[in-house]
């Protein structure tokens, strides 16, 4: 079935899920909407409807009942985002990440693993990678490193890509800046998905780049750093 690999890649907590009801767009062009948690099993019908673009998009909570996960994400919430420049920076830093366009036009930057790993390891590595890429302060999923389902914890969900497949505009982007079909995304996943040992071995030391404008505004130096990284390739 078409959902099988997609489901295996994005599997998370199975006793609750998220949904998002889109609303109108704001003055900045960002779509408004209502996000909420539904307590119940994540059924095959939900996965299938998501890929078919039927009903609300599916949000999955990455952290499971045993506090492990097989995917995590840096959520870069910027409108009119330059995904290609980000991918160049990712490859320049030799990070095993896949970039997807988010529903707002920003980026969901995924780290995938072939097996469940501790949520604490996933979260800490993604925080370090966000700093390297210049997006410190971005939301990181999983947001929790521990949940207690006995007391009703669920964790936070992330809206998945490929709602209505390519038509939904939430798709992976390859190293050339082109959008990927679902099958092309699966091939990207096969290339970049890591084992636990590979995640532990990811080097996350921030590169020391001399400030272009010593004593200048942080935002200006951040922009200059991104330009330096872009032309290092």
Indicate where each model-derived feature is located.
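DNA replication initiation on ssDNA origins
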Residues: 1-71, 80-88, 156-157, 162-165, ...
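Short beta-strand
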Residues: 61-63, 97-104, 139-143
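Histidine-centered divalent-metal-coordination microenvironment in nucleic-acid enzymes
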Residues: 74, 96-122, 148-161
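Active-site-adjacent loop/helix surface patches within enzyme catalytic domains
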Residues: 74-76, 81-101
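Helical (often loop-to-helix) elements that flank the catalytic cores of nucleotide-handling enzymes
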Residues: 84-92, 112-139, 166-187
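Internal intein/HINT superfamily modules and their associated LAGLIDADG
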Residues: 96-99, 105, 116, 131, ...
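Flexible helix-coil linker/hinge segments at domain or subdomain boundaries
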Residues: 130-168, 189-204
């Amino acid at each position: 079935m078409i959902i099988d690999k997609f489901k295996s890649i994005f599997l998370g907590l199975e006793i609750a899920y998220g949904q998002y009801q889109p609303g109108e767009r704001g003055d900045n062009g960002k779509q408004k909407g209502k996000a909420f948690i539904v307590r119940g099993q994540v059924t095959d019908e939900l996965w299938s409807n998501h890929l078919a673009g039927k009903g609300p998009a599916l949000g999955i909570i990455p952290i499971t009942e045993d506090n492990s996960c097989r995917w995590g994400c840096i959520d870069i919430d910027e409108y009119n985002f330059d995904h290609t420049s980000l991918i160049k920076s990712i490859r320049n830093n030799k990070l095993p990440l896949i970039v997807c366009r988010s529903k707002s036009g920003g980026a969901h930057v995924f780290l995938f693993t072939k097996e469940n790993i501790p949520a604490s390891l996933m979260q800490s590595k993604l925080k370090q990678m966000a700093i390297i890429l210049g997006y410190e302060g971005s939301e990181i999923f999983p947001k929790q490193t521990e949940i207690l389902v006995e007391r009703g914890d669920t964790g936070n969900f992330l809206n998945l890509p490929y709602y209505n497949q390519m038509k939904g505009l939430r798709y992976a982007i390859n190293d050339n800046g082109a959008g990927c079909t679902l099958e092309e995304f699966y091939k990207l996943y096969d290339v970049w998905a890591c084992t636990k040992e590979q995640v532990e071995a990811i080097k996350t030391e921030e590169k020391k780049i001399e400030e272009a404008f010593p004593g200048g505004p942080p935002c200006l130096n951040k922009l200059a750093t991104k330009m330096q990284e872009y032309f290092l390739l």
